[in-house]
Amino acid sequence: MVIFFDIDGTIIDERTHTIPESTIRAVEQLRKNGHTPIINTGRPYFQVDSRVKEMAFQGYSCGCGMEVMLCGEFLVRAKPSLALRQKSVECSRRFHMLSFYETQDGGILLDGEHSVHPLMSREVERLRSAGRPIYELAQT
């Protein structure tokens, strides 16, 4: 049986920011019992906490399914198509929403029009200072 786990509040305790020993043992026991524990998260794989990667998970579904790994091998590493990114920009502008995609190289694809929003400008600055790439969402 395949069993999916989220990270925040399920694997990592939101109050203490730790992984309880009981959680580590439970995931190990699942594998011993023949089950396949998988992490399912909206964040990209590069952002998965190293403590989670050290656990007995056999796979990861990351970035809302844009990256899928099983037994250490990526089966899917997709980038949203230009058409999808352009549609995302169109919809986010129409409904006054912020939209962005985190990329596998640690960068961010965002609608340049929203980069002036305080939340986005802080995130863009944080990524830039970490040497991460910033891409225009609706182009290339």
Language-model features, listed with the residues they occupy:
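Asp-based phosphoryl-transfer active-site loop
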Residues: 1-16, 39
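A short acidic/small-residue loop/turn micro-motif
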Residues: 19-21
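A short, hydrophobic secondary-structure junction motif
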Residues: 31, 38, 133, 139-140
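Acidic, His- and aromatic-enriched active-site or binding-groove loops in soluble protein domains
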Residues: 116-139
